[in-house]
Amino acid sequence: MSLTEQLLRPLLASPAKPLITHYDDQLGSRVELSVATTLNWAAKTANWLVDEFDVEPGDEVAVQLPAHWQTAGILLGAWWCGARVVPASAGARVVFIGPDASVDAPAVAVVSLDPMGRGLSTPPPGGALDYLTEARMSGDQFTPLSPIPGDTPALESSTVDEILTEARARAEKLGLSAADRALSTLDWTIPDGVLDGFLVPLAASAHLVQITHADPAKLDRKREAERTTTDLG
């Protein structure tokens, strides 16, 4: 079973439960995603990766993005179809980059990072694709063509089973549970940032309050407003 299915299966009984709250202090934005909405974006991404790029289990997908709710959907979608998430573009079926970045690769998906989920205002150059505009047309449900084995690489060289075991162990060490609301300012570097800042709270079914471009002067107010119970960093 894929990493995404194993992480989200315990949450399916409460689809309306808030799962990710994303702040961008540079933009002054706040976006909240429920379990259902997160699952929806993951499914759209997985379908798009399979249909547009023929991604199969073990294929590399490069993700060069900040901690963001859109990045969450991309990561979960990639794992759902069995992709191996890597930071480097060489050998990747597709490279996901932000709107101000550029990369020399055969297949590039540009992610607008717009808080409200709008696509790019102008078409990306060089044959690159607008991820949000393209992927939102894909299906809201996804089923892998075949089960994803636990020894499939999922995050650089670590397998599905290894990542899940490590994320659960770190969550247990932190005392995280489904009742927690975890505030994080960690960047989602690959692999450590993604593991500590994204997978650990998911493994505990905790609510993640992720702050990008965090303003230190506003953190205490956010802790109070979001009723967070712990800090991840």
Regions found by a protein language model. Give the residues of each.
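A short N-terminal helical cap/helix-turn-helix that marks the beginning
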Residues: M1-T21
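A generic structural signal for well-ordered alpha-helical segments
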Residues: L11, A78-W79, P201, R223
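Conserved AMP-binding/adenylate-forming core of the ANL superfamily
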Residues: T21-V55, G150-L176
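Conserved AMP-binding/adenylate-forming
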Residues: W48-A83, A88, A178-V200
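Short beta-strand->loop structural element characteristic of the AMP-binding/adenylate-forming
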Residues: V63-Q64, T71, L75-V103, A109-P123, ...
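ANL superfamily adenylate-forming
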Residues: V94-L174, R223-G233
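Conserved AMP-binding/adenylation subdomain of ANL enzymes
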Residues: R168-A179, T189-G233
